[in-house]
Regions:
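A short, well-structured juxtamembrane/interface segment
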Residues: 7-12, 173-184
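A structural connector/turn signal
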Residues: 2-3, 56, 180
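Active-site/ligand-binding-proximal alpha/beta "capping" segment
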Residues: 165-167, 171
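Single conserved hydrophobic/aromatic residue that forms the stacking wall/gate
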Residues: 1-10, 15, 192-195
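Long hydrophobic segments that form regular secondary structure
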Residues: 185-190
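Glycine-rich phosphate-binding loops that contact phosphosugars or nucleotide phosphates
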Residues: 18-163, 195
Length: 195
């Protein structure tokens, strides 16, 4: 689903020469990872801002800018205000959101839905994980389109990403062993780990 989603929004994104990622809270940290992976795979400079700061520093945004707004709810007011500022300056806006039809999604040129479902816990683990997946897929696709990554690299990375669910299942099967190990390590005052 992510691969189809990124292709649907991809062609217009690849002609930009500057990228801004703007978000708040946990989504901001997904944006920081996005910066690293986009710069590495696409070779385009990326800036990441906390949404509340973006509007007040008069950022260099124009029609050659891709503005990525990341928001779990799609209703984060600071992110929405930053998105409006970027659009006013001519940027192409891509939102990475979880909630279909949210304000951020409606006001964006393109939307990449995370499909994380509702977040029950305070820790935004599902949303963060799916936002990271979106950032990786976006970077891979843009890198492929710009010729910065090869088709073999792209296909291999996609294969690895698709393996994540089975790797997680293997990990969770080891939960009893991990719990036992944690009980052993819990009272130690010092642990030395070497290769």
């Amino acid at each position: 689903a992510y691969e189809i989603g990124v292709r649907r929004v991809g062609s217009e994104m690849c002609i930009r020469d500057r990228i801004y990622i703007v978000a708040c809270g946990t989504a901001y940290h997904a944006g920081l990872v996005g910066k690293y992976i986009i710069e590495r795979l696409v070779k385009i400079p990326v800036e990441v801002d906390v949404a509340s700061e973006f509007r007040y520093r008069d950022p260099l945004v124009d029609e050659n800018t891709l503005f990525i707004a990341i928001s779990q709810s799609g209703e984060t007011l600071d992110t929405l205000a930053a998105l409006r500022e970027a659009k006013k300056k001519g940027a192409r806006v891509l939102s990475v959101v979880n909630v279909v039809g949210s304000s951020v999604a409606r006001e964006s040129d393109d939307v990449f839905y995370t499909w994380a479902g509702p977040e029950i816990a305070v820790a935004s683990t599902k949303a963060y994980t799916t936002q990271l997946m979106c950032m990786y897929m976006l970077a891979l696709y843009m890198g492929l389109e710009k010729g910065a990554v090869t088709k073999d690299y792209y296909d291999g990375f996609i294969r690895d990403l698709k393996d994540i669910p089975s790797k997680m299942e293997e990990f969770f099967k080891k939960a009893p062993q991990i719990e036992e190990l944690s009980k052993t390590l819990y009272n130690l005052s010092l642990i030395h780990i070497s290769e």
